[in-house]
Amino acid sequence: MKSSQSDYKKRGMLDMNLCNQLQEASYTELIDTLQSSHADWRTACIHLLSKKYNTHPQFTDVLLQQLVKEKALYTKIEIQTQLSQYGQISKMCQYLGCIGDNQYRAIPLRGSKKKSYPLPRDLIARSLAHMEVQRFQDFFVELPQLSYSQLLEAIDAFGFLCFYHQSLVNKETYEYIKTCILNYWDDDLMLWKLMTCLSAFPMAIDLLQELQTQQKHPTILMEVERSLKLLIN
């Protein structure tokens, strides 16, 4: 059934007319309006905060705290989009694995059969995955400091970025993934995600072929074979 204009408003679809009404609002006024019960007003506030006040010291905190409690679909999408562009990466990383319940908690029975790289399920990882390549190094230096649950989601963003931006594929990023494989060899969920990461690295063919002979877990083995197929074909 086709959604009505009212449905889109309730879900927080960005309305440029509202943005125009709020164009002259101060930072404090936008923060106050962000508490509105109307999702489309909240989306307009996020949009304008990002355009006008993205260098404010509390900008990233405001967006992250709103994302934690936000229910409206399009408002959440707007927050994620603006975090990708302007969010402080170190602060974003602290929220990895904390928002929503769509993350993998255990290795699935079957992996993806697609030729594309899987979109991260964690909302913050998804924002990180879509940031500009120029911001990658700021993300990369955060990885060693992350907790296990944070790294579990960060790896999805890392692989996504490397897969779609081959300029990020180099000895340093490849060695990092190999180190993770050694460190998490007995962790099926992390290892499965790392096998997906290897699909971004053309130099990983020999390693994947070796892993193909060693790996016994059926889902991990399927991911090894999927990555190999993508690299060879």
Protein language model annotation of sequence segments:
Residues S36-D40, K71-A72, G100-Q103, Y117, ...:
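Short inter-helical turns and helix N-cap capping residues of alpha-solenoid HEAT/ARM repeat scaffolds
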